[in-house]
């Protein structure tokens, strides 16, 4: 009988139940809430679901995920050594149509203006006591680009990766709720009714030349983001060249889906209780909202400048699409415009600043890496 009891005690002490802490329990509950949001509310389910499950698994004690070489540690290496974000960018490039930006290159300025949110949040984070590397990682949330946020944070402040990723993807899913009030605050009803002319046709040569030129210029200007921009442009070249259909299909479907699973699960695995349950996490979530709101406002206000300069030919609503939540932000511009003018179709015009925002966020990340990467 004593042997049986000792065996039971041994099983208990070796189990995860005995080592479970209050922090682990809280983070498992956080993971369950994220699963609920992903499944029941459909908030970025392709990303939040693996993040949530990774979070839950990370808070099981005595698993050896962080110490024993295995699939979980290998997934972590994919983030630590910057493998997954560039591969995601290849898929994004294959799914992105740069035609609206090529047809109206002035909208590149709107994509740049929307990055003001990144630097507003960076300044706010430094005022709250974060160091410059942590502040830069928090600020990039304002670009509304999950892979870029993960890429920059894994280089500058890997201990903040879980909080930054959850904030970035949460706000991306809430674009239709966050942006419209800010857009209406920065515009009048008459301005929202402005119709824009149709975009000119874009030639095949322009579509092929654009990713090549962007890859060369940005990579030479900002070498720290050469892998992101190179993969983005390569994926786009697969799509527009007309001769690599199989590669394009693989990049934007099978490969992108596989890497998304690994990237999101690996991000969730960083969300251990000792790293996540801090006052800093709430500050990051609040600063992320400030960054996103400031980026939206910055894009719309620059759209106002373009409206004035063009003699009321530019609808300032397209400026809000300068954040790189593709194509959600462009759809929001379209929806808000339709409410005040049911015959106003802004989607294609808004796609210009939207895809410019993808490039703009990568450039902002590269600038901060060059300045603060040390």
Q: Predicted regions span which residues?
A:
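Small-residue-rich segments of transmembrane alpha-helices in multi-pass membrane proteins
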Residues: 52-59, 112-123, 142-149, 213, ...
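Membrane-embedded hairpin module used as a gating/binding unit in multi-pass transport
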Residues: 170-243
